[in-house]
Amino acid sequence: MMKFKRFGHDGIHKRLQVGSSVIALSAFALLMTACSSTPSYPPQYPTDPVQPRPVEPDPRPEPQEPDLETPEENVEDYDDTEQRDGLTPPHMEGRDVKRLALLLPFSSSSERLRAEADSMMKAAELAVFERDSADVLLIALDTGGTAQGAQSAARAALNSGADVILGPILSGSVNAAKQVASSSRTPILAFSTDQRVAGDGAYLLSFPPEAEVERIVEYASDTGVDRFAFFGPTSEYGRRVNDAYRKAVRENGGEITASASYSGDDITVMQEPARSMANQYRSTRYQAIILPEGGTALRSLAPLLPYYNVDPSSVQFLGTGLWKNNAVAREPALNGGVFAGPDPDAQADFEASYDRAYGENNSRLASQAYDAVAIGAYVAEGRPRDRMERLEDPNGFYGADGLIRFEADGKPQRGLAVYQIRNGKFVVIDPAPRTVLGPS
């Protein structure tokens, strides 16, 4: 895992006291484009603060998109000039406007994606109003949840003079947006967890499972574990975790001594592989086993191991961020299990701010949209030719999800905490780093 050292950019996340404060309408500009409904503007803050409520991650994999067809029209060439004409509302005339285009699936056929987009839009709006500047223009564009829609939205973003593109969410949409944005070297801060779409100007703000696996394996190795086992699904998510797990174990000087997989999320398909894991335990005495599942599937999987005499008090159960779910924490077989996840202190601050502004829970990706605005505004302050370099600042950024810095290939390096499940609660046993050391 990367080492950390103190970073700068403290002004990026300058916060206003929200409570009963009133923020002038003229301070910021927000433009909603190609969306059936417009969020309230500006956000209204209740007088009495509301305590934040926990937000559980959605363990479902990223929805799949159809492959992008050949573009219907050629993308115009955009020059990398010092000043690009763009959309400027009348009240922002004469200012050095920083244009951030937010590409989200507002009209997706998926109700879940539409709800996610709505919460992310609110978080982005909140970030604009909390940033102490009068020169940020947020341009919201609808992708429809398709690659073709993302391509059209990215083209509209460039035509509006966007300095940075925020989004999209889905991997196919990110690839489509890259095809458009690459000619102008306009950076993209995307929300996909698929690391294969990173690079060529696209930087991922997400939490790839590979990073979580790397963190938890390093932690287990530091506690003396050197014999590891894998027990998970044959899904795309399971494959990614398995590959990352084997790599991390090898890099930390350990070995995989047992492994079993299954297809599906029903307990009946898990029973025989669980029996196999028990048999392998008797012969190899592995010290830790990773269970890359979440929700109902994990609550079905975990009890099978002690049922077949793999004792959680003797074998360390390891997980991924999918474990951070209150129902999972109540599963007795997972008591004592450990997994890696975002910095809880940073997330709590954001959740409280969002709750005060909107009186509701934020979605799973809302914090990433919030950070995207703050980072995007900082990047847009630089000359067009310097924006990639500003994004790849080795000092990184600290935001609503904790520490992040971007590698040159667009992949994120995250400062993750290690959690342990104790009597139905999540307890941080190894805090997330807040400083960056060593090369990126």
Region locations from a protein language model:
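Beta-alpha junction/loop-to-helix N-cap segments that form part of ligand/metal-binding clefts
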Residues: 116-119, 130, 134-196
